Structure formats: structure tokens, C-alpha cells
A protein has these predicted regions:
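N-terminal low-complexity, acidic/polar interaction/targeting segments
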Residues: 1-253
């Protein structure tokens, strides 16, 4: 389904998913104009991540083709001319054409179909992803407990996939890869692989920290049990000998 033209907000170093609420700071003139235009219409804006965050005036080749249509929830104009905006992603969409001729970017987009076609394979995959995410939340303490609670009451596989993706501690490119997967089964499989990898990484980190802690405790215990030295440490003897040699040499002058 194609939509009419919609203002575009290029994003630096962040990917916004459907269902995600995100605060954004906007300072570029084009982006400020896009937000103002959005507020004058239906408060809808198309969020597209940039391939390179250092690009100031992106064109179509500088932006990823898959983004998220979002609704502006709050907008606050700051004294320095920048804008703090709170947005909520509503739907996944594909960039069709980009208009750069105005004082803000606008686009023709195609909303991605999210009708859940239920089958046994998808149901099993969703169950595996949910179980893996629960394990992930046990090792990653940054996951709020209410996320698990909310997931347990969800039945929409698309929403489940997006909520899990939002809470994965993977890089921007990896999140963009997931956002751009229109096939739900492929997306869930990719999420599952990232979950397994992240859990392994956290467990390995925990093992290393535990090993280092035990070694430090062992060293400290050995130091506490060692009898006090009655003779000067070897390093002091070596320094003393060096000083004596220096003194003997000085007698010849």
C-alpha cells in the first residue's frame, strides 16, 4: 500500500522500531522544517537511519531503504534553536522515492504488510525466541522486568519480534538489518541467532570476571597468611649495593 508524501527525519546512530518510544534531539534545518511540517498536518513522520552519521545533508543513497513511520507525541523547542521530540513508531515502511527539492525531505513510501499468517513453524519459532529472551534478560540486567511481563501477554508475532529487537544490545547496523527483514520467519530466525550470541557473550564475560575475582581473592589470602619479612626485601638490597658502587667510584675523582 503506497501512501501520500510524508516528511522524512534522517536519524544518526539510532534505529526506531514500530512500538518503540524514543526521545530525539533535532538540530539540522531540514529536519526542523520536516518536524514543523509534520506538526501542521497529522503529526506523522518517516524515520530513516543514515548509513553514515557524519553526513549532514543526506540524499537517497545516504539513507537506508527501510524505516519506521512514527507519530510525534511531544515537541519542545529549546532556546538554542534545536528541538527535543518524543516519537512513537507505528509501522514499518519502505522508501520508494525521496524528494529533496523543498526545504525539508519528504518521501513516497510503502507500508509493509504485518498481517500474521499463523502456522506451526512460526508458533514454534516465536516460542523459542520468547524462551531465549527470558534467558537473555537473566544475564542482561538492563532489561526491565515489565518488558518480560508485557511480552508474556502478547499474541502478535510481529509485535513480539519488534519488542525483542528493541531490547537487544546489538549495534545499529544489526538493528537496521532486522528492521529491513520484511519476512517474519527470517526476522525471527535472525533475532534467535543474535540472542544465542549475546547470551554466550554475557556468560563468557561472567566466567572471566569470576576467574579474575577468584585469583585476586587467592592472592590476597596468600599475602595475609605470609609471615612478616625479617630481612630487607631484595629490591632494597639491590638499591643499597648500587649506591655503594656509586660511592666507591666517586672516591677516584
Amino acid at each position: 500500500m503506497s501512501s501520500s508524501s510524508i516528511p522524512v527525519l534522517p536519524l544518526r546512530d539510532i534505529v526506531v522500531f514500530p512500538g518503540m518510544v524514543a526521545p530525539l534531539f533535532v538540530g539540522r534545518k531540514q529536519s526542523v522544517n520536516a518536524l514543523n511540517h509534520s506538526m501542521n498536518l497529522d503529526k506523522k513522520i518517516f524515520l530513516l537511519a543514515q548509513k553514515n552519521s557524519e553526513t549532514d545533508n543526506p540524499n537517497k543513497s545516504d539513507l537506508y531503504e527501510c524505516g519506521t513511520v512514527a507519530k510525534v507525541l511531544q515537541l519542545l523547542k529549546l532556546p538554542d534553536g534545536t528541538i527535543k521530540v518524543l516519537v512513537e513508531g507505528t509501522s514499518r515502511a519502505q522508501l520508494m522515492t525521496l524528494n529533496t527539492s523543498n526545504d525539508f525531505l519528504s518521501a513516497k513510501i510503502k507500508i509493509v504488510d504485518t498481517k500474521f499468517k499463523n502456522n506451526n513453524n512460526l508458533k514454534a519459532l516465536v516460542k523459542v525466541v520468547l524462551e531465549q529472551f527470558e534467558d537473555y534478560a537473566k544475564v542482561n540486567k538492563k532489561i526491565p522486568s515489565e518488558v518480560i511481563t508485557n511480552l508474556s501477554s502478547m499474541t502478535d508475532a510481529y509485535k513480539i519480534a519488534d519488542v525483542v529487537s528493541i531490547n537487544l544490545t546489538i549495534n545499529m547496523q544489526q538493528k537496521q538489518e532486522i528492521l529491513g527483514m520484511f519476512n517474519l520467519e527470517e526476522r525471527l530466525n535472525k533475532i534467535h541467532l543474535y540472542l544465542v550470541s549475546e547470551i554466550d557473550s554475557f556468560q563468557m564475560e561472567k566466567k572471566i570476571k569470576g576467574r579474575v575475582k577468584r585469583q585476586m581473592e587467592k592472592t590476597q589470602k596468600e599475602q595475609n597468611q605470609s609471615p612478616p619479612e625479617t630481612n630487607p626485601p631484595r629490591i632494597f638490597l639491590e638499591v643499597h649495593q648500587q649506591l655503594n658502587r656509586t660511592a666507591n667510584h666517586s672516591l677516584h675523582f
